[in-house]
From Swiss-Prot:
Gene: FUM19
Induction, as annotated: Expression is strongly reduced by benomyl. Induced by exogenous fumonisin B1.
Positions contributing to ATP binding: 625-632, 1254-1261
Protein name per Swiss-Prot or TrEMBL: ABC transporter FUM19
SUPFAM superfamilies: ABC transporter transmembrane region, P-loop containing nucleoside triphosphate hydrolases
Recorded family membership: Belongs to the ABC transporter superfamily. ABCC family. Conjugate transporter (TC 3.A.1.208) subfamily.
Basic and acidic residues: bias regions: 852-862
Molecular function, one GO term: ABC-type transporter activity
Source organism: Gibberella moniliformis (strain M3125 / FGSC 7600)
Keywords in alphabetical order: ATP-binding, Cell membrane, Glycoprotein, Hydrolase, Membrane, Nucleotide-binding, Phosphoprotein, Repeat, Transmembrane, Transmembrane helix, Transport
Amino acid sequence: MMNFEGCPSDASFGPFVKGCRGDFDFTLKFELIIFFIAPSCVFTALTFVRIFVLVSKSRIMTGNRIPLNLIKNVYSPIQIRENCFSSSQVLGLVAGMTTAALSYYEHWYSRRPSMLLSIYLFLSLLLDIAHDRTLWLNAYSTLEYGFSSVFSAAVAIKAFAVWLESRPLSKLPWGDSHVKETPDSTSGVYSLSSFMWLRGLLRLGYRKVLALSDLPALHGNMLGVVYDRFRKCSVNHFTRAEQSQERGKYKLVHALSTTLTLHLLLPVLPRIALIGLSLAQAFLTQAVLRYLEEDQPHSYSWGLIGATVLIYGGISICTSLYWYFHERLLCLVRGCLASAIFHKTLELSLTSNARSASVTLMSTDIDRIHKGFLNLHELWANIVEAGLAAWFLWRQVGIAFIAPIGLVLLSFLGVSIVGNYVGLYQKAWMGKIQNRVAITANVISNIKHLKVSGMTRPVESIIQNTRESELRASRGTRRLQIASLIIAFAPDLTAPGIMLAATKSQDFSSHKVYTAIALLTLLTVPLGSIFRSVSPLMSAFACLERIQAFLELDTRKDPRLITHSTPDTSSASGDEKVYADPLPMSRSSAVKVIQASFGWQGKEQACLKNINLTVNYSALTAIIGPVGSGKSTLCKALLGETPFSAGKVVLERDASCKVGYCDQTPFIRNCSIKENIVGFSKWNPVRYLEVVEASMLSYDLRELPEGDATIVGSGGMTLSGGQKQRIAIARSLYLDTRLLILDDILSGLDTQTEHHLFQHVLSPNGLLKKRENAPAIVFSTHSVKYARWADHIFLLNEKGEMIEQGSWEELSTYQSHLQSLCIQEKVQMTDLKQLEPVESEQPLDVTMSEIEQTRSSRRGADNQETIASGADSSARQNGDLGVYRHYFRAVPPVAIISFVTSSLSYGFLYSFPNIWLKWWLLDADSTRPHHPKAFWNGIYAMFQILALLSELLTMYLALTYFALISGATVHSSALRAITRAPLYFFASVDLGTITNYFSQDMTLVDGALPASLIQFASDVAASLGMAGNLAASSPYLAASYPLCFFLLYFVTKYYLRTSRQLRLLDLEAKSPLYAHFLELENGIATIRAADWTGEYLVQSRLLLDVSQRPAYLLAMVQRWLLFILNTFVSLLALFTVALVTQLNNHGTGFAGAGLISLMQIGQFLTNVVRSYATLEVSMGAVSRLKALTESPHRECIEGQEVVPPQEWPCRGSIKIDGVSASYDSQNDQVNEKSFSLRELNLHIEAGQKVAICGRTGSGKSSIILLLLHMLRPLRNTREDAITIDGISIQNVDPPILRERIFAVPQDTIFLPQGSSWLENMEPFATNAAECRSVLEDVNLWDVVIAQGGDLTAALDSDTLSQGQRQLFGLARAVLRKRAKAQSMSEPAPQGGLLLLDEPSSAVDFETEGLMHRVIQREFCEYTVIMVTHRLEFITQIHSVGQVSVDTQQGLFDRVLVVDAGTIVEDGHPAQLLESKEGKFRALWEASRV
């Protein structure tokens, strides 16, 4: 046992000794209690809690950890023998045993080294080192020296144990190296606090261009387990609130906090430690100044140096741990919210306008939530820190502390007033963003039809006007943001002058003033942080309210009843109501509709009324009716998708599980053809080849260079309409289902393909009837040509009422409506078996290995294209100053110079008052002051007020000037680049990628960029000023600045090479996720019918986790840089304190100014890192937008566009000489297989009416696209190879070309939901009366009346049938023609060019006659080129109830038959019909069936 006779004070608690050891040590009793007993008690208690948590988990580790436990057990008895008190001996033994036990359980049940054990061992090691020093200083006898030596050995063993405990388990010699985890999930507290686990990623990013595959996966806790738990919590909170009829705004916040409680609490402990360490900075300043002013032992200086190391080193470590845990929390918040939004999107009804909001909520709103929650823990921590600082300040300056506190209270009042309005303005702004993104996404997804329609420039103008309206709506939020920031800066800038003015002269000593300034800094800086956080936090809560409102929307209510013989409901999905035999249904019945009515806008406006229908297994049920009769509505009603219904729809259980559904508009995913067909079904090669043959795709797959591995582009951009339709048919055939619903699937197909499909799929001898469990088939159509072979026929009239139903035999026994339709359409009653057999397609002979090989090579090419997109490899690593020029190009140079000047002025005016205070104190300490206090105080306050005004100017320029001007310019450039991009660009670039430019990228440009620019510029300027103050405190420190700047430059360069790439990967990785959302929005009915919602949810989780990886790692790399800078500040603090205490030749004035600057520069460097991190992410968005704007993908060389005369084309003559073209990019080495047109030669005289026909995929629509400069010829084509009225179209400005040529696409494009009828026609409208006249001509005025009564009513395009959509497209063309005629100031030829791409593919016989009459009447003097599969009107004119048999009186005087991109027949239809072996004759005879 040690004796205390050498130092009597060792027997007391102390804590400091007196009269021995230089009066610079703790007493032994204090060390035993504080260094041994207290830590052992706390550690033992926490150990039992930790072991209890660990044993509840499953074992994850194998291997042997006996060596580590032996080391700790060896250390324990060595440790406790020196203790002189029995309590310390017992607790030391218990701590040693619990250390071994905890190490054992952590090894078996935890992936990472024990944090609790690592912290305890490290802290106890530091305390043991201090105690070891005491033992050696107190040793006098041989026994005591021996004991001290043994304890030193014990300290060395503990140091080794600390090193072992910090190692990842897989790297220990006895660990399990087979466990593969992410670096941070296996790292100990030392690696986490220093971010050493990132060193591999940083090295990799410095050496090479990073790809997503180079990034480690996220920790398992960030995956689906947390998301599922959040979903359950949110459902429970919303359900309880609904049951209690509460309308709380924070239900989503409660659900998040409940789900992430542990992650929410983890940052608390290091943040509390930061509070204590921050306050310790002020007391360190006071202690150093007292040491310089008073005569104290030199040993105290070493204590101050040690305290500096502990305080600033502790700040670095605690800051790192705090941000590590907090960034993980933010990552999980984003994942939970995005997952919930996607899940809710799956549940919304087809008519919900909120589906288009999902992308905005997931991008813009979640980003603002992330920004607002970034300082979530800072709120309470800053309040605590400010409260403690205020108390210490009161003790330091007395009553003078009331002055800054009054200013703080006024600031609180101002922030409260501002905060009340932030949410209101923020919601209005977000609504504008949501509207713009919805319009943009709708336009991009329909860009092909938009270009064909000639609406590019009008729609571009509409979107840009929407953008400018959005920027105007942001002004209110920006002004509030400026007010909030100024209020936040005010206390920090003006409080010191107010406090010094209230301070008594007798309290004006250096150490008191500088200590008060330090405490005031600890008061105002946290409060300023709170004030700056209020606006983003209120914005975050406003966005959370928007997401909560989205999640609380009514879900799709499936009114269908599922029947089966037992009450088992396990297979029922969604909201379907399940009953055990609610109605008598025979085993052969799949669906029964009983006295049902269906509608989209309310039960009083039902589209279908009093429907009774039975659909049987192994039977084909044909639903026949004219345009707008409700055929598509009935199909969707059988799927449970109609929002309003009455009566009953009963499904047999087998028919309800999976339903094969083909919509009129095919749902095509942006993947390979094979993946589109197979979907999420199990792979069956026999079934796959079977459905490919049946859907007549084998020929197309042989013609495509990559076969079924061909990527089809967003919405099937590279495919023809018929190919898309047949892929959708093949998908429904491949699906293992007992019910198929086919909505007018044969429209848009050529006659031969149509017959082939019906014969091989739907006929009595077709594929479906031959299957073992033949499904029930519902087939809607406007034609009666296949009614004879239907098992059940269901006829509808134009009012949505059933006329008659029954089998063919039943309906043909009397004068039925069916027979009148057959007579009207002149349908031959020929049996299918009597038709000439369709040429057998060559079987698809492609092995799966070839397909996979092709697909893998395609992926490699895509990856290379992705890497090259946005910026080249060098720019991704080293940056591009051109990005800043691109952003500021629209800003006047005077504004930029003013911004830089105001920022630098702020930096000088903020830092110089510390030097002024030093001069003031020197003058005050002199016996005869040169100036009164008012002089010094007034100038001091003047500097601070000028600094505030400089910052106000900086904010105004960035937020209201740069943001509005540059935001509009950058958007306009990007939008122009997209609308003028060639068609192949949209086939190769995903829809989600393009949408991401206008959602997340544009959001960063609007919000994060100007705010981070202000913060970065101000903090850099202030940091430079503080560095000057530090240099003034010690010339030796100033001498080290060149080395410091060199090190900072190297660290920053090392950091930027990785962070730049991560920021681009962060933006790029979200594009597939956005594309997935948009894909879901377009195909939700098909996905729900096939019961693929679970698979889509899993896929969304995978895409979400992939998108999280670069964002999470970018945040961590930014925190690594913060740790390096904090370490740098720690070294500066160490050198500063060491120099001023050891040399002691600078006086307290400069030392105090230097220490105050040291406190402030740490905070400024933290803000610099934070603001630069946001700035570089925002500039990454600008970089992507710049790359898009400067993309080489252009329809015409910028600046070389030719604008033809206003009246062009006035005749419509066309000349095409030897042109070959491909959908691929302009490449002379294009595979000939990919040619869409081959050596095309075509001359069309003015005024000719030309019909183009041929099998689907033969190149008919390609001719239309060629004339519209959307399909460009090969590069070696002559410039005058394509002319219209003698002018080559290759250099004509493409948007102008498409405006001058009137074209009607197969699929009509509409503006987003909510736009009026007039707005949808307004780009070409002359007046409302003209619009009404045109709509009446095409029989759409009754639809207008039904939807609201006039042209200002909202046009609900979802309720329009495909035929009505095509009528609207024709109405637009008529309106354009009339507008052109009225715009001519002088008489001019009234001719022109009209292109129609299957304009009547989805209409019935009578409506088609109407459309042809309108075309003949309105465009009689025009050259008309029509692509059509329906040949009845090529050779004869039909009128209602009357047929002309004179084939010489046909609408068209010329027919082109196209096959494989080549014109194989050309002539008058009558002449071509005379050729019995001709292609046109074969097509025409097939159409007569």
